């Protein structure tokens, strides 16, 4: 409960990567269509901040879906893979995979910007939301405060956020 944040990395081999290297298949999601990182980064910006991520989570009884998303960025590596960096104070169940899945649906043209905006403005579970496969997801870093602040941070982490605390989209 003392962590102040976590960073996940998700790896995608899209159509621009000219096929999936067999050595990468165990930790990379193969998406046949080309993805435009600049367009995905622009769309991802609207998800940043303290908000209700119910549309992108599998809710757990008694838990909040309000989280502070600090970074959601798509970068093409030298090898042609796309690395998605996702940083938040905490994550709901399936949140990273749901966010990546939703943005890939948008990036491949299977969903439009209005659909993505609707997920943000009106949080709620949608059965058709694509969950990105788990094998391409890795926990990269956990952030902690100075040891003398562990107790304070643990209290903040245990406090359940309420709907009125989330920013409006």
What function would you assign to each model-found segment?
Residues 1-169:
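Structured-RNA-binding interfaces characteristic of tRNA pseudouridine synthases
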